[in-house]
């Protein structure tokens, strides 16, 4: 019984600024409700605060902000992020299609061999001149490798530039290391 009196005194001192305050304080009192419960003959009091997180409203309006409370309208944020992801996916597919039809030619020294790759680094064709064929298989192998490396570097550079342009068009800051 002594603990109940101590708890009551504690809450009275906690609520003392509301007892004879100004109008703003009196309106704040509407959000504090004392609950009386009888439990096995004892009169226990508990304090419920309805003012936090938008609880305790009498009108049941279905506005997003009152439902979300202090966190804001999470549903609208989720939908905005979802739309942004869809835009990124659509633009990325568009860039991939552009790269798939683009062709990049690579040459060896003396342009005896020409290798053509797509923007997705897929080989399309290899052109070998008669002069390169006369050099022998070992030298021809080196020339084809050199031309392939040249075409590959041009294709990768073009892909990075297009992806960087895509990132900048979507509002990402320029110069991200992962895109260059």
Curated annotation (Swiss-Prot):
One of its GO terms (cellular component) is chloroplast envelope. It comes from the Eukaryota. Disulfide bonds: none annotated. Residues 56-65 have a biased composition (Basic and acidic residues). The keyword Transit peptide applies. Belongs to the YbaB/EbfC family. This is Nucleoid-associated protein At4g30620, chloroplastic. It comes from Arabidopsis thaliana.
């Amino acid at each position: 019984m002594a603990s109940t009196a101590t708890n009551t005194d504690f809450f009275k001192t906690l609520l003392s600024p509301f007892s004879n305050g100004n109008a703003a304080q009196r309106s704040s009192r509407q959000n504090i409700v004392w609950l009386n419960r009888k439990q096995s003959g004892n009169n226990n009091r508990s304090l419920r605060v309805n003012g936090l997180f938008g609880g305790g409203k009498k009108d049941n309006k279905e506005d997003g902000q009152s439902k979300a409370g202090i966190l804001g309208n999470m549903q609208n944020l989720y939908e905005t992020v979802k739309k942004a992801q869809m835009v990124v996916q659509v633009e990325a597919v568009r860039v991939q299609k552009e790269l798939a039809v683009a062709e990049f030619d690579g040459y060896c020294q003396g342009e005896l061999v020409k290798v053509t790759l797509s923007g997705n680094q897929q080989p399309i064709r290899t052109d070998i001149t008669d002069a390169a064929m006369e050099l022998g298989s070992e030298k021809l192998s080196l020339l084809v490798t050199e031309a392939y490396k040249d075409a590959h570097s041009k294709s990768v550079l073009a892909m990075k530039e297009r992806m960087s342009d895509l990132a900048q068009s979507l509002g990402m800051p320029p110069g991200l290391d992962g895109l260059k």
